[in-house]
């Protein structure tokens, strides 16, 4: 099955982010618990929704080569205010590495992202003249699942390239 995904090449700078690390199978990780921890941290520190925030999940390991139970991911809120904050509990401050990326835009439920990744890595990337770098990739969430129907969720996949 060939999916139609919008794609573009984009360069971005390093950005500081609040993050909560999860370890284990990407398909069963407790993302909502991690998001709740970060949002509660923001509320406790009177940052509100962190203003200009980007909501991102960074995937640090390749599930094709790393055992599922050892796969690491960081659930992140990246915003300018992060520079003024301190780590606390499970909430850390990390840098999301910038660089050159191929970006794919997917519209649909998060439950379909596994199929999207299969499509991207087995069909779409092989048709592009880009070299994927062995670095962390990330998802950027463009709307809020609390207020958006699953079929209307917008997720960008940011894959580092040469």
What positions do the PLM features span?
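A solvent-exposed interaction/effector surface
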Residues: 1-162
């Amino acid at each position: 099955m060939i999916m139609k995904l919008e794609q573009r090449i984009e360069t971005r700078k390093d950005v500081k982010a609040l993050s909560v690390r999860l370890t284990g199978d990407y398909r069963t990780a407790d993302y909502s618990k991690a998001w709740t921890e970060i949002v509660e941290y923001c509320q406790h520190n009177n940052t509100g929704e962190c203003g200009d925030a980007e909501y991102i999940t960074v995937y640090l390991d390749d599930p094709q080569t790393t055992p599922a139970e050892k796969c690491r991911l960081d659930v992140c809120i990246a915003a300018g205010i992060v520079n003024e904050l301190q780590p606390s509990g499970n909430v850390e401050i990390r840098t999301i590495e910038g660089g050159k990326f191929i970006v794919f835009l997917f519209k649909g439920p998060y439950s379909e992202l596994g199929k999207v990744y299969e499509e991207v890595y087995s069909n779409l990337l092989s048709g592009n003249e880009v070299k994927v770098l062995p670095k962390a990739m990330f998802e950027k969430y463009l709307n809020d699942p609390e207020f958006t129907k699953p079929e209307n969720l917008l997720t960008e996949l940011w894959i580092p390239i040469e």
